[in-house]
Amino acid sequence: MDEDVGLEATNYSRGDESRSEEQEKNVVRWRIVQQSTGPNPKPRHGHRAVVLKELIVIFGGGNEGMIDELHAYNTQKREWTAPQCCGDVPTPAAAFGAISLGNKIYRFGGMTEYGKYTNDLYELQSTRWEWRRLNPRVHSNGHLPCPRIGHSFVVSQKSQKAYVFGGLSNDLNDPKRNVPHYLDDLYVINLSGPQHLIWEKLNATGPGPISRESHTAVIYEKDSISRMVVYGGMNGVRLGDLWYLNLNTLHWTEIKFDDPRTGIPPMPRSLHSSVLIGDKMFVYGGWVPLLEHASTEQQTEKEWKCTSSLGCWNITEDRWVPLHLYCSDEDTIPRGRAGHCAAAVGDRMYIWSGRDGYRKAWSNQVCCRDMWLLDTILPEQPGKVQLGRAGFNSLEISWPIVQGASGYFLQIGFGDAKEQSVSPIKRATTSPRKQPSIVPPSQKETEQSPKKPQGTAPSIISTQGTTYTAPADPKPATDEGGLPQDLFEDTEKNETASPKRSNDAQSADSSTCEQKKTDESGLEEDSEKDQKPSDAGETDEMKEENGDDDLPWFDVGIIDKATINVTHYFNDRQQSLEKQLNDLIDHNAFKCVNDSVFTTEDKIPLINGQSYRFRVSAINGLGKGAWSETASCKTCVPGYPSAPSSIRITKSHEGAQLTWEPPSNTNISGKIIEYSVYLAVKNQSANSADSQLAFMRVYCGPQADCQVLQSNLGTAFVDQTNKPAIIFRIAARNEKGYGPATQVRWLQDQQKIPVRTNYPNNSGFIYQQHGGQQKRARFDHQ
């Protein structure tokens, strides 16, 4: 590892210090990214990376010639893809500038061949992977930015203005005769109006930075502060200066490092990378000068080297923060490199490829093939666990994905002290195969919902639940606990709305129940004749735990996905996962009660009609984050129908046609009397900002199909999680009452309907492309 005064290499142990102490020490940890699937991109240098939500898009650069491929790395799935681009595909280039704004990527400048530079501006629409060459104009008497390489190209997410600073141009504009010229000019272009793009040269005030190339820049915006931070670069010598450009006043300010309060700066460098995480700019790698120079005045390649050192500039405190490596062993950190790419996803920095700087193969530089990530802080607290589907001996749950999490630690407990007193925990330890007797419905359950009609399905169901499509079981169920086995196959579909709203679930439920009372009247009248079920119709309802903090917790597992079908939990024969956590993290390993290596001697099954509590914490290389809020849900009671399956939705002129298969356990639970279909709508509460989604019933009848009119679809809430989708829930009822519901997301990317977007460059609606009206809808199935 390179010596760098800005980085302290120390091996830490999680057990030696608390979370707050680690944060005070600014401990960071490198981890190599392994076990990625998909087509890996070719190693290279001079390429760029931009971030689109959880995707890192890498393109350009080269080694043995320019590379014209584009790859996207999904940080959640750990998967590479190579989208096929269309449109005005640009000529392959290196050392260009690249930014992302909303769902678009922009490329400016770069080198298309040795000595030949460009000033072309391209736009890539990532929803279609379609390139478009843009033709910006200039103000009167103005000029376009000259062709250049090694410049910085950054964008303000607030103003949607992109800034170009510095770079290197060829004065002769002749590829065969290259006369390099370092630049210090500053240009801006407003990308909010793609039909009226204008380049404008800015004349900032104050002494500005000297001309340079191969530097980095980031834009920091918070409240009224908006500034561009320029660091390092090359102008015949490596530079280590740092500058602020106030984007509101266009005034340059140099940050002097002669004040001890600014900390100890890293070594001057060029061809490094910088990313912004929170209020910190992390600087990695690049070419740095050697501490001892050769005696000759002629510069040789031995006078500088590639570094693997890190620097961290705190923008709010205006100081270099000393970082501490969690582990400094040679194989636990990336080797030095330059011309690589870096991207920040959440609180993590990713780096990929770049020039090795130490070895040469024939006339070509050796490029690194590896990807590394840097954990900079413990992961955030996850949102509450949400129920997707309840079975008789299983609970399918999920929670919002935490960016920067390598895995999740899930624990389960009994619902309250009364249920704990009748639980078989102690007996199951000595006789794990012995099934406890089923506890009959208690009077407590009746007291909890005295006004709920008998057998009535709840009119409002939390939309934070898991989303899936459940195909029909090809074989008749032999017991009432059978569930489809192909659920939860894709963690991308588990992302849910903001967990901060989940605290209002109960209040939203009660308020919306009053609004939808008329819609439920038919069900209420029929339900009066039914026997009161033991909360079988309430298995989708999630409740926040306010007490029972002293009840024990049991391990379900350390898993890599934000979803799981819980059927068992570990008994106390197994060592606590908390004690195994360090070793599992160090080896990037997972351990779950569902693993085939564990037998009935190691685990305890869930029982029907039982209320369980859940909590989850996110894990990364630095350890375990805070536990989520506790949530509880209940397994089904025997005798009620299971959830409908094989849901199919097709578009029609009148609206949407839904069909489904009856519950798989009808041979046991008996004849299905009716089905209810619910549509997710926005809850119209007084405080709309904090309101929960509500489910409005749009069908109640005996047939396993229904038509949802366009007038109802017009009131639907379009969920923007991952992909625009409309959410339905379908439940079946027998003589005892309603069983659990199946939730399905009807993807809208084939429909031409208005979809609300969160992209900053589109304040209204975007319209999805219209596909065949009778095509089968694609589902986010788990």
UniProtKB/Swiss-Prot annotation:
Phenotype upon changing S449A: Drastically reduces phosphorylation in vitro
Bias (Acidic residues) ranges: 537-552
Encoding gene, per UniProt annotation: hcf-1
Organism per entry: Caenorhabditis elegans
UniProt subcellular location: Nucleus
Function: Transcriptional coregulator. Involved in control of the cell cycle and in modulating mitotic histone phosphorylation. Plays a role in modulating lifespan by regulating the transcriptional activity of daf-16/Forkhead box protein O, in concert with protein deacetylase sir-2.1/SIRT1, and perhaps acting independently of the Insulin/IGF-1-like signaling (IIS) mediated pathway. Negatively modulates responses to environmental stresses, including oxidative stress, heat stress, and exposure to heavy metals; acting via regulation of the transcription factors daf-16 and skn-1.
One annotated Gene Ontology cellular component of this protein: transcription regulator complex
A Pfam family matched in the record: Kelch_HCF
Keywords, ordered alphabetically: Kelch repeat, Nucleus, Phosphoprotein, Repeat
Post-translational modification: Phosphorylated at multiple serine residues. Phosphorylation is developmentally regulated, occurring in embryos but not L1 larvae. Phosphorylation may be cell-cycle-regulated.
Kelch repeat ranges per the UniProt record: 55-103, 105-151, 161-222, 227-271, 280-324
Protein name as catalogued: Host cell factor homolog hcf-1
Principal subcellular localisation of the protein: nucleus
SMART domains: FN3 (SM00060)
Record note on quaternary structure: Interacts with daf-16/FOXO. Interacts with deacetylase sir-2.1. Interacts with the 14-3-3 family proteins ftt-2 and par-5.
Positions of post-translational Phosphoserine modification: S423, S431, S449, S498
